[in-house]
Amino acid sequence: TSDYSSRNITRTDRDQPGYDVNGNVSYTRSLSKRSRLSFEYRINYTDNSVERNTFVLTKENVFPDERNPRQSTEYDYAYLTHRIGSTYQYYFKKTKIAGTLHYQHAAFSSDYAFPYARKTETSFDNLTYSVVANINVNRNNTLKFNASGRTSNPRATDLQDIVNTTNRQNVFAGNPGLDPVYTHRLSGQYIRANPAKGRTFTVSAEATASPNTITDSLVIDSPDFVIDDEGTKLGEGNQYPKPVNLAGLWSLRASVNYGMPVRWLRSNLNFRAGI
């Protein structure tokens, strides 16, 4: 086996061309004087090429023409995303309600050419939603609700089924088995206003939940840890992160706010408490 902890003087050349193409089409139809329905389709294609060549200074103090295979890399990757859905909107006086539902299909492909050939393909199918309501109970009282579910797909570098040794002190590996991050959010707000006296009272609450997030599994202080199929060791002082899904991220926030005018200050005074 070889030890990856040796230190050398290097020169690195990097080239990363890419392009992004997207388009969308939508159609909206009124269902009544108070409601309407719209349909939407979006497509996005992202293509990138990465070439990083590292040359190690020889004993003769010259950089060779041949790149170092352990610190050089060459690959292409692409993301193709289709998104289709509809939105329903309802209006009555000062009350507004809107609901959106989308289906999204994202296909990822990567061709790793150097230092070894490796192809990675995966896809994600997700449903995202959004519901927004703004209800005027009367002149002084308003209720607001918001519920949404959104996804964030893994990055291209996180999905590649390779061990990247271009950074000598931070060797990292991809994980093609990653799942998207799905975040659900629910919030509500009650507002009581007294326009005559300029006073407002607000109660707000918000809950967020992500059943699975993406974080790094980190190997440190393990110089004998084998990082690839060739038996290369991590080496002294280096670290080895790898992205993984981690379950259970929850948060809850709430606050109360009271505002009133202060004439002698010619300004408003606000009191706020929250958790």
Where are these regions (language model features)?
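Primarily recognizes Gram-negative and organellar outer-membrane beta-barrels
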Residues: 1-275
